[in-house]
């Protein structure tokens, strides 16, 4: 886990140097010019984390005090956030080292600063080199040693010291995949209501929920994005499929990030499909909040400190230098009744390759819901669920970063010889939804079919959770928050088969879909009002 620099002079941090640098796999090409401006997010650790962990356990336990009693940002900060005194000391340290404070954070977890490479090297006693990337045709910059600093305040992490891993969206397109894979075959049968029998977002609502009264009223969904989007592509989709768009789409610029396309042309496929899929599942939600930023720490932290959307979705993958970097924020999500769904990746089983590592994070973190993908067949266009098998590109397996297995996966019966899961490390995914090469998308000014990926599954689950929380609120309850402790209890319970569609056929090249939990599609896909009633109580 992340190593905290304790209160002593020249305190050293860990997990800031890339393995490619320490091993020599990345050849050093020179030094980063000292005038280069870098944006850093300095993170402080939580306080009383043991107490917070107990609070989170109680949050999901009906017999415990604090059951489903979410905290406000102010309450979380007062109880578990860094102190104002420590935050101020870090601010003064930054300014004393010629680092400009770009933004502060209400929860005091993140301090955003900007400075020259020369000043950053001096402040943290390191050298930032330029290296040849070992697996990509480009160079990257990174520190050659761990940061040490003259500061009597503990730090959690300093984000932004390297650009080794570039985030990428977790979707695929049939023409591209067919050209590169001789074994590729088109999904069959096709039962969608869109052009070419492709699936529309509304088909997912019909298949996984039905025609009931829940529509997301009063709820918001938050979408995590690294690039901006064009709203015209969203409206193009709904106009093309002849459906109304009654949900406000609101862009949230994180630290000044551009909300629209940064150039005359940009690929906003990921952003558009996230928006469309979430809205289609909950077509009367209050708003879809599209958080656009340049680094994961700032985007996630903005979602937490806004604390508006209780259902969040991330369909991007990257390989962090420290796999625990975002944990303080993920725990704040849970304490505030927010739930993050993360796409599990589109390259099959996690087998330790660089591509798998880029796909697995953040989905293999234990404090969020990892979402795999399936091939769904409905009972005709716009019809109910009929059958479902595993999508063989669905990411899953034990954590490549060897993150410790969480308590909810240690429940009796979850990990067994049939699913071949790990008893030591976090297993992914947790749940799944449709994501085969049979989805219709509008982006970059045009529309086409043949799109796939766990990128579709994650926002579909976020939209579905808006329905769950809508019913919970109508029943006089608070938002459910982090779902995994609840889902896994359902999974080992007597009503599992009625609450989930258990995926028992197919594989992701290493792991098989089996009865119960598996490392291809988790517990499976949502079974409409049955699952909603199990989580939110029957509608009154």
PLM region descriptions:
Residues 333, 342, 368, 378-384, ...:
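Predominantly extracellular beta-rich ligand-binding scaffolds that present long acidic/polar faces
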Residues 8-106, 112, 117-373, 395, ...:
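Substrate-binding/charge-relay-adjacent region of secreted/lumenal peptidase catalytic domains
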